């Protein structure tokens, strides 16, 4: 059976991921007029730029949907966001500033929960607004078929008839007006924005040019901290984790993880924390550029990693970072629920996150400028007396112990010296004139 439909399946139930914007509104009305039985599904992802979610299903029914459903995805989204923090599932960074994979996390939740809701209504054909050049078309494809193996995909933006009739936003606006809906296009921005409770993505249009920077972006989750007229005061923040779960901010305990994340967003957003400018490789290996916001993710990530480094040993931290980068890439590719991702994620949650209990006190300033003021945990393995430069009683080790430890290093030093001589004899290394320092053959100079 063909999975991807190239033309509208007339007379059949077709579910559309409906945002209420011009694109999906025009698509829904067009599909209805062409003979499809339209069902609209809207994900409440806690988008910071969405004023009234309850209005969206009503609009869908006005445009011809037989049924319009609002699916509350916020709790699941926060659950996945915390799992990503616990497992360090972030592979894109520039100069130590991280992209927190907030859009891939949103797609994992949307793609599974909306298709599950459609399946309950007997809807086995799904359409959404993703284009053929982006990542989302593959992410939604994977998550949709994982959730419903009988699913078929119909995307208006892959249907040549739809493109010919309503190929651009101007045509869509004119179409809606002609049908009596007087749908006006929103003011055209210099970039496009996609957001959820975890973060916001700004990309495309002017941001495709690398000489257009972060300063053209109007943040929706924080403040434009780069502007001189933006007043940002330093703020002390205390973040508490219990067995890997964030539980309290500034002494206030949260039983609702969504409420905690909203507060973390508010705190981090006051400073512009978590904004980054990244060049990344899309799934199809072409590079794209985005400006990202994730104030709450950044705040929790900083505190979590501080506790990780104070609690776990070096080899555990190394595996956490290596596995986290691999897991981040799988998440980005739409494989968050694949077995290889679940294996990496569960390992980190069990053996790394479970030990992370404690409080971290930070001072937030402008943007990603912060200081860590204090770290407390009953599980800390940081013991300053072990390495104190002062004289201490019951020292962990003595000078004689260190002499013995260094003497044992003679074994591998001798082996290394032998290997360096071998490499020199074979021409891989050379010694510079008048020096015993080895150089790689192609480093001569």
Curated annotation (Swiss-Prot):
Q: What is the official name of this protein in its record? A: Argininosuccinate synthase
* Class of the enzyme per the UniProt entry, highest EC level: ligase
Residue positions annotated to bind L-aspartate are: 131, 135-136
* The enzyme's E.C. designation: 6.3.4.5
Residue ranges annotated as coiled coil are: none
Reaction(s) this enzyme catalyzes, per UniProt:
L-citrulline + L-aspartate + ATP = 2-(N(omega)-L-arginino)succinate + AMP + diphosphate + H(+)
* Cross-referenced InterPro entries: Arg_succ_synth_type2_subfam, Arginosuc_syn_C, Arginosuc_syn_N, Arginosuc_synth, Arginosuc_synth_CS, Arginosuc_synth_type_1_subfam, AS_cat/multimer_dom_body, AS_multimer_C_tail
Keywords attached to this entry: Amino-acid biosynthesis, Arginine biosynthesis, ATP-binding, Cytoplasm, Ligase, Nucleotide-binding
- Spell out the CDD domains in the cross-references: ASS (cd01999)
* Amino acids binding L-citrulline: 99, 135, 139, 192, 201, 203, 280
What is the similarity comment for this entry?
Answer: Belongs to the argininosuccinate synthase family. Type 2 subfamily.
Binding annotation for ATP: 17-25, 43, 129, 131, 136, 194
Tell me, what is one Gene Ontology molecular-function annotation carried by this entry? Answer: ATP binding
Q: Which PANTHER family match?
A: ARGININOSUCCINATE SYNTHASE (PTHR11587:SF2)
Instruction: Please give an example of a GO cellular component term from this record.
Output: cytoplasm
Question: Could you tell me which NCBIfam families the record lists for this protein?
Answer: argG, PRK05370.1
Q: What lineage, starting at the top, does this entry show? A: Bacteria, Pseudomonadati, Pseudomonadota, Alphaproteobacteria, Hyphomicrobiales
């Amino acid at each position: 059976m063909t999975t991807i439909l190239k033309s509208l399946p007339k007379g059949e139930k077709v579910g559309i991921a409906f945002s209420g914007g011009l694109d999906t509104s025009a698509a829904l009305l067009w599909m209805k007029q062409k003979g499809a039985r339209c069902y609209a599904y809207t994900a409440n992802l806690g988008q910071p730029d969405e004023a009234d979610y309850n209005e969206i299903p009503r609009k869908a029914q006005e445009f011809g949907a037989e049924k319009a459903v609002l699916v509350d995805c916020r709790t699941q989204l926060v659950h996945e966001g915390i799992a990503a923090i616990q497992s360090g599932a972030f592979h894109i960074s520039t100069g130590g500033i991280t992209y927190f994979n907030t859009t891939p996390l949103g797609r994992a939740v949307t793609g599974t929960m909306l298709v599950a809701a459609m399946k309950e209504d007997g809807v086995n054909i799904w359409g959404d607004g993703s284009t053929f050049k982006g990542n989302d078309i593959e992410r939604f494809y994977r998550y949709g078929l994982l959730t419903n193996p009988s699913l078929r995909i119909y995307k208006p933006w892959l249907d040549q008839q739809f493109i010919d009739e309503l190929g651009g936003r101007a045509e869509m606006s004119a179409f809606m007006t002609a049908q009596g809906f007087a749908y006006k296009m929103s003011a055209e921005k210099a970039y496009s924005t996609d957001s959820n409770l975890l973060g916001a993505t700004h990309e495309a249009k002017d941001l495709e040019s690398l000489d257009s920077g972060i300063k053209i972006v109007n943040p929706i989750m924080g403040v434009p901290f780069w502007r001189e007229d933006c007043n940002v005061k330093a703020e002390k923040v205390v973040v508490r984790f219990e067995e890997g779960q964030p539980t309290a901010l500034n002494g206030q305990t949260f039983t609702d993880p969504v409420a905690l994340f909203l507060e973390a967003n508010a705190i981090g957003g006051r400073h512009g924390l978590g904004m980054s400018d990244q060049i990344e490789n899309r799934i199809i290996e072409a590079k794209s550029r985005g400006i990202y916001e994730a104030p709450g993710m950044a705040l929790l990530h900083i505190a979590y990693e501080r506790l990780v480094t104070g609690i776990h040993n070096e080899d555990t931290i190394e595996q956490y970072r290596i596995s986290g980068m691999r897991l981040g890439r799988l998440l980005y590719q739409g494989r968050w629920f694949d077995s290889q991702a679940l294996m990496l994620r569960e390992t980190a949650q069990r053996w790394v996150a479970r030990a992370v209990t404690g409080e971290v006190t930070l001072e937030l300033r402008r943007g990603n400028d912060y200081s860590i003021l204090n770290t407390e945990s009953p599980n800390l393995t940081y013991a300053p007396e072990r390495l104190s430069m002062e004289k201490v009683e019951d020292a962990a080790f003595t000078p004689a112990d260190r002499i013995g430890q260094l003497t044992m290093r003679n074994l591998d030093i001798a082996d290394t010296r032998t290997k360096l001589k071998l490499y020199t004899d074979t021409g891989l290394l050379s010694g510079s004139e008048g020096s015993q320092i080895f150089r790689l053959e192609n480093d001569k100079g």
